[in-house]
A protein has these predicted regions:
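Hydrophobic alpha-helical interaction segments
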Residues: 132-208
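Short, surface-exposed loop/turn motifs that are enriched in glycine and acidic residues
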Residues: 62, 78-82, 136
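Amphipathic alpha-helical interface surfaces
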Residues: 31, 88-89, 142
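Short coil/loop linkers at secondary-structure junctions
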Residues: 27, 98-99, 190, 203
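A short, charged helix-loop
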Residues: 122-131
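Alpha-helix N-cap/helix-initiation sites
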Residues: 24, 28, 45-46, 85-86, ...
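Short beta-edge/loop segments at beta->alpha junctions of small alpha/beta modules
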Residues: 1-76
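Short gly/ser-rich loop at a beta-strand->alpha-helix junction or flexible surface loop bordering the NTP-binding
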Residues: 47-51, 78-116, 121
Length: 208
């Protein structure tokens, strides 16, 4: 049964992208019909166009929903289980403890972007999608994410000096990012990134 397949492949309370469902010899049209039947029966819940999930049991009448950022990750940042994008903007600065700002708009960079800049709506939330400077993969997504942050660090960061340097280097050490990893991608960024890295104390302080 299709339901058993969905449980095995996607699990409970995880995003199910209609476009990724491949079940036996069932056609796309038949899959859509079966998904609609499961949704009408309350076995599946619709999150947004083409996105469903198997809800877990809940004591609340409204039931459960999916974490927004989890949906973003599956829809835009992964392709066949591999990385094809990353979060960017204020969310990354907040993750590193560089700002107390909470992002009102989700910003991502993805190989799936069809334009350099595009705005879409997902579950009534605005998402900004940018095309990457080079193709994103499992090996470079953290590096490109870090360089995107450094390009605009002067705009995002509320901390400076040693605090800024310590938080940046801690992140680099955590994800094993060395200057030699950054160097081959610097060509794709504007010259201001060198100034930002210097002012953050990274040109001489990047872990070797």
């Amino acid at each position: 049964m299709l339901y058993d397949y969905l449980i095995d492949v996607y699990g409970i309370n995880e995003p199910i992208l209609l476009s990724t469902i491949k079940y036996e010899d069932m056609s796309e049209g038949s899959i859509r019909q079966q998904i609609k039947k499961l949704t009408d029966a309350g076995i599946l819940k619709r999150y947004d166009t083409g996105i469903y999930f198997i809800p877990k049991e809940s004591v609340f009448k409204a039931g459960t929903s999916l974490p927004f950022y989890r949906v973003i990750e599956e829809k835009y940042l992964k392709e066949s289980g591999n990385r094809c994008g990353y979060f960017s903007g204020v969310a990354v600065a907040n993750e590193l403890g560089l700002t107390t700002q909470v992002p009102m708009i989700c910003e991502i960079t993805s190989n799936k972007a069809t334009n350099d800049y595009r705005e879409v709506m997902l579950a009534n939330n605005k998402v900004i999608i940018r095309r990457p400077k080079v193709l994103v993969n499992n090996e470079n997504y953290r590096i490109l994410q870090f360089l995107d942050l450094m390009k605009d660090i002067d705009h995002y960061s509320e901390v400076k000096g040693e605090v800024l340097k310590d938080r940046l280097t801690a992140y680099m050490e955590k994800h094993i990012i060395k200057f030699e990893n950054l160097e081959k991608y610097l060509y794709y960024y504007p010259d201001k990134i060198y100034r930002n890295m210097y002012q953050a104390g990274l040109l001489k302080g990047v872990p070797e």
